[in-house]
Amino acid sequence: MTCNCLVAQLQSEASGWIDPSRNWVVTGRERHVAAARSGNVGYPQRAIRTEDFLYIVNFQPDRWPMGDPLPRLSDDLPTSEQLRQNTFATFADMDASPTRTWLIEHRSDPQAQRFFELAFGRRPKFELYDLKKDPHQIDNVAMQPEYIEVRNSLQKQLLQELRDTDDPRVVGTGETFDLP
């Protein structure tokens, strides 16, 4: 892992964008809860954020981002109490909570379906959000023709940074975090 010291920004009396040379950040995710998915595999993501855009690569889009839906969202769901109090009841990468419980219990309601999908649905391999137009990062514009140049530029920058820092998802087989 590499980083740059943030002490100057943390101790600064200024607010907002303090150091103009810091104009992007790379973040990553592998897992939140180890047993959220069969085989204890993670949900590998890497992202680059600039002032205007957030670009995300989901390395395994066939996996469930919030963990496997156990049971398979049949009619035989865990009770409300289990959903609220047991992280492992279903979608274990989202901690047990009233919000998670409500979303799961109302997943078939027409007004709640979109929110359920945003919270628990599978994600595409590439996501791009225009933060000026969509600050809440709801509308993925990665495949829209007018964003292809931005997407390609951010993808190139992200992958170069990951290679330069020997990120295990882009160096070697890319499976380091998935191996026991």
Show the residue positions of the predicted features.
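Long, internal low-complexity/basic segments
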Residues: 101-126, 131-180
